[in-house]
Amino acid sequence: MKTIIVFLSLLVLATKFGDAKEGVNQEQKKEVTQNEFRVEYLNEMAAMSLLQQLEAXESALFEKEAGRNSRQXRCAMGDVPCTKGKTNCCKGYECKPKSPSWWYDTDFCQPIHGGRPIGI
């Protein structure tokens, strides 16, 4: 019976002092995790800033490349029907009547300066 009382008293003391240490440990854990989150947050913010800079540089390069490689798409060359209101003729061509003939109902893309257009 005496041994049981000794073990129970040791158990009570261990739990009492164990809880005290556990509280201190939890406070230390909170501080450590807060510091880790701060560091992780700062690292993440730096990474996001770097990512935004890279995306901005990449978009600028793509715009420059697209501007360099751009060309007129689907333009009409010589003797292709066109409409006066829409400019679907290529560079160096203009939409005008083919000849003073009455049977041509539409206009055609024709070179601006007679023969071969300038710039093509």
UniProtKB/Swiss-Prot annotation:
Primary location class: secreted
Signal peptide: 1-20
Tissue: Expressed by the venom gland.
Cellular component terms per the entry's GO annotation: extracellular region
Function comment: Ion channel inhibitor.
Record-stated family: Belongs to the neurotoxin 14 (magi-1) family. 05 (ICK-7) subfamily. ICK-7 sub-subfamily.
The name this protein goes by in its record: U13-barytoxin-Tl1a
Organism field: Trittame loki (Brush-footed trapdoor spider)
